[in-house]
Amino acid sequence: MGRFSFNRYGYNTMQMESVESEKTRFEVECEFVQALANPNYLNFLAQRGYFKEEYFVNYLKYLLYWKDPQYARCLKFPQCLHMLEALQSQQFRDSMAYGPSAKFVEDQVVLQWQFYLRKRHRLCMMPDEGQELEESEDEADIRQKDTEDEDDEETMKKPDADTAEKNSTTSTVSKKEK
């Protein structure tokens, strides 16, 4: 069974692979594609100059076959496909060399994971109750805001009580002095 691949100089070469070597290559490429989901790893690659090498950019283009559903179903971190797509842009590759850019991308990935994906999972698990779930979350948000407002009011009242206590203590002391 033959397979086209890119060598380090960017040229297509026809190579004969055994079943075992195909399996190994599949696993290695799968792991590498999933590693692209980590913005810190992208920062590492960019700082080491990999994104400036033509053979590596060609390899990233070659890896786009992972977007095919038969391959994508093997991925544990599907956001890696978005990163792989973004890496096709020279501007994105250049910006990943800077720590703050990588940190920004990492923050966005974390926010996506924390909020959108959890809510989506709950909605997918309970499609009939999805509307009720959204309403109950809105009610919970309102209750949370009310609780915060009450806490703020109590906080505002406490300094007044402390001030009144100090004033009464001061007035008691001043009466004793007279």
Curated annotation (Swiss-Prot):
Transmembrane segments: none annotated. Residues 129-140 have a biased composition (Acidic residues). GO terms for cellular component: core mediator complex; mediator complex. This is Mediator of RNA polymerase II transcription subunit 31. PANTHER family: MEDIATOR OF RNA POLYMERASE II TRANSCRIPTION SUBUNIT 31 (PTHR13186). Pfam families: Med31 (PF05669). Residues 166-178 have a biased composition (Polar residues). Belongs to the Mediator complex subunit 31 family. InterPro entries: Med31_sf, Mediator_Med31. Residues 129-178 are annotated as: Disordered. One of its GO terms (molecular function) is transcription coregulator activity. Component of the Mediator complex, a coactivator involved in the regulated transcription of nearly all RNA polymerase II-dependent genes. Mediator functions as a bridge to convey information from gene-specific regulatory proteins to the basal RNA polymerase II transcription machinery. Mediator is recruited to promoters by direct interactions with regulatory proteins and serves as a scaffold for the assembly of a functional preinitiation complex with RNA polymerase II and the general transcription factors. The keyword Zinc-finger does not apply. The lineage of its organism: Eukaryota, Metazoa, Ecdysozoa, Nematoda, Chromadorea. Component of the Mediator complex. Keywords: Activator, Nucleus, Transcription, Transcription regulation. Residues 155-165 have a biased composition (Basic and acidic residues). Gene3D superfamilies: Mediator of RNA polymerase II, submodule Med31 (Soh1) (1.10.10.1340).
